[in-house]
């Protein structure tokens, strides 16, 4: 053991003073040892013998060996504790910690064999006080239009937000299913329908300039749309609504007319078991022609075309007839 370490001075602490006088005091105690002093040890001899028996080469242990080994271990532990306590006082603490012992082992060469046994606790990086949160700007509503057809075709859904295309997916559907598509260019036609009291269904439609938009449904199939219900508390709820295709068999939308016009139409079905659709609104320069059949009965359709900004005053066309025998529904044209 050694007393080196640069301790001492007028301003030395109690631990440093005890360390300076440690080895002279130990040497004096060793010289004054008697046989009675070896009978009682501060460290239990049973543990010392157990440690010594861990070596496979040790077959027998003499009676004096555990006693001397216990005395040496006591001196070693006392010196290491004093050196660790110096580090504790430097950090202005009153409790000896594992890191203090590791620092004492690191600073003094005679304890190098303990570096792997008592490793120094490395400084861990500080934990983040606040987690990184990704803020997502609420996206504007994506507008779509739907088309119903009886022949197999591809479904192409394209959403546009602020003039840029964001998503695109293509898949194949079976005959009689709903086709939903979003063109990259064209005007937007919101269509609002009221189904029953307090129930409102809004379908936003868009089509390219100069192209016709058609929606057809085969016999027996259903069309599912989302309807908005305004409750008594003012909350808006969206629930799916199924419309029987036998009640709405053909829906035809003609080509848009030139100029800015507002077409407002009121559609009323006469079937007793059908749901009542009372209002359809078409905006931004497009004209709508619609026809509804149920079996052999053709329901009346009333449409009014007025320039944008003027009040609704005159009806446009009303027709009621039986469905032709060839199964093709007559088109309703506007004057």
Curated annotation (Swiss-Prot):
GO terms for molecular function: DNA binding; DNA-binding transcription activator activity, RNA polymerase II-specific; protein heterodimerization activity. One of its GO terms (cellular component) is nucleus. Heterotrimeric transcription factor composed of three components, NF-YA, NF-YB and NF-YC. NF-YB and NF-YC must interact and dimerize for NF-YA association and DNA binding. The gene is NFYC. Component of the sequence-specific heterotrimeric transcription factor (NF-Y) which specifically recognizes a 5'-CCAAT-3' box motif found in the promoters of its target genes. NF-Y can function as both an activator and a repressor, depending on its interacting cofactors. Its main location: nucleus. It comes from the Eukaryota. This is Nuclear transcription factor Y subunit gamma. Pfam families: Histone. Keywords: Activator, DNA-binding, Nucleus, Transcription, Transcription regulation. It is found in: Nucleus. GO terms for biological process: regulation of transcription by RNA polymerase II. Belongs to the NFYC/HAP5 subunit family.
